[in-house]
A protein has these predicted regions:
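A conserved short coil-to-beta-strand element within the FAD-binding core of flavoproteins
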Residues: 119-133
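Core beta-strand elements of the Rossmann-like FAD/NAD(P) dinucleotide-binding domain
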Residues: 139-147
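C-terminal helical "tail/cap" subdomain of flavin- and related membrane-associated enzymes
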Residues: 285-351
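Glycine-rich FAD pyrophosphate-binding loop
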Residues: 21-41
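Conserved FAD-binding catalytic core of PHBH/FMO-like flavoproteins
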Residues: 108, 147, 151-242
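Beta1/beta-strand and adjacent pyrophosphate-binding region of the FAD-binding site
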Residues: 1-12
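Active-site-adjacent segment of FAD-dependent monooxygenases/related oxidoreductases
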Residues: 38-109, 205-206
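Conserved mid-domain beta->alpha element of the FAD-binding
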Residues: 11-18, 106, 150, 240-313
Length: 351
């Protein structure tokens, strides 16, 4: 029986573990946290991710609980300058669900295959031999397996232990975030973007009924929002910086990188979690059918493509002055035709 160790129990690691278990591997999954996360980093779930998670049973459960986004609108002040539908066919039916709920559905699916996440296990070392990889946790716990998957995030211990460089750069400035409850916010199922002076931007993303995420490249996301929002409850606030990086390789011997351990980029477009899910599903299939030699090249190319799209979108949102006005004026005109709408939305959601 094929044995696999998975390091990291976010969406990427959980997807890898459940797909491997479904396909017949003996899998163990380890997480350094002391339990399942109650925080939500990602929200958007593409049709492709739901399709990939359908065989294990998590996809339909996620789709049933998630909200379905109707569209996105970009404003200058309170005036819309661009509007796109996101629900005119199944190919573009983007859903939204807090990441902790997505993880909960994956954990439930994993349990149906008899696998539990092993918490409070932080990787300390790896030993790679010709026929196995041994993961070390502390001084006394060693877990051998034929393959190991590093799905342990942007600060991956697996990646650093392998000596794989994480090439790229940090973007200047900090972004802020606020997850809030607002019963009166009118845009229940639409992304609402606001173009602010000096190239700044603020976005409101629906997460669940009456729950929203406000994101801005400013010190205080709620203060940056240029239109009134009556907030009933603040669930959390925080700040973050953006890295644009990619591992120089996704594989070293029988050890593989997936998700944020392999690539990170701006949240524009909501592609990060979905890219990690796709990495994991592809890798699980390749491990079980013996085609792992193609993983590095294929997923590196897809990661590079998503980084390029994400950066193009971020630069567009943060461009300044006349260039931005001309760009959105042009997009506003072409986006009124259904073929153009489909092309734009498919570019946003593909992969």
């Amino acid at each position: 029986m094929t044995t696999v160790t998975v390091i990291g129990a976010g969406p990427t690691g959980l997807t890898a573990a459940v797909e491997l278990a479904r396909l017949g591997a003996k899998v163990r999954i380890f997480e350094k946290r002391d339990g399942a996360s109650n925080l939500s980093r990602a929200v958007g779930i593409t049709p492709g991710s739901i399709e990939l998670l359908t065989p294990c049973g998590a996809g339909p459960a996620i789709e049933a609980e998630a909200i379905r986004f109707e569209g996105l609108t970009v404003h200058r002040g309170d005036h819309p300058v661009l509007s796109l539908p996101l629900n005119f066919d199944a190919r573009s039916s983007l859903h939204g669900l807090p990441q902790d709920r997505t993880e909960a559905h994956l954990i439930d699916a994993l349990a149906r295959y008899g696998v539990q996440v092993e918490y409070n296990r932080e990787l300390t070392n790896l030993h790679i031999e010709a026929d196995r990889v041994t993961a070390c946790f502390g001084r006394h716990i060693e877990v051998p397996s034929k393959y190991l998957i590093g799905a342990d995030g942007a600060h991956s211990r697996v990646r650093s232990t392998l000596g794989i460089h994480f090439l790229g750069h940090d973007l200047p400035g900090r972004w802020s975030i606020a997850d809030v409850h607002s019963a009166s916010w009118p845009h229940k199922t639409r992304f609402s973007g606001y173009l602010l002076p000096k190239g700044h931007v603020c976005v409101v993303v629906p997460m669940a009924p009456d729950r929203y995420r406000v994101i801005a490249d400013a010190d205080d996301a709620l203060k940056a929002l240029p239109v009134p929002m009556e907030v009933d409850q603040v669930h959390r606030t925080g700040s973050f910086t953006i890295q644009v990086r990619q591992a120089e390789q996704y594989r070293k011997g029988a050890v593989f990188l997936a998700g944020d351990a392999a690539h990170v980029h701006s949240p524009v477009g909501g592609r990060g979690m979905n890219l990690g899910i796709a990495d994991a599903a592809d890798l699980a299939r390749r491990i079980m059918d013996g085609t792992t030699q193609g993983y590095d090249e294929a997923r590196y190319a897809e990661g590079e493509h998503v980084i390029q799209i994400s950066e193009r979108g971020r630069r567009m949102l943060q461009s300044k002055g006349a260039a931005k006005r001309a760009l959105f004026a042009t997009m506003s005109v072409i986006s009124h035709t259904p073929p153009a709408q489909r092309a734009i939305v498919h570019q946003l959601l593909s992969g």
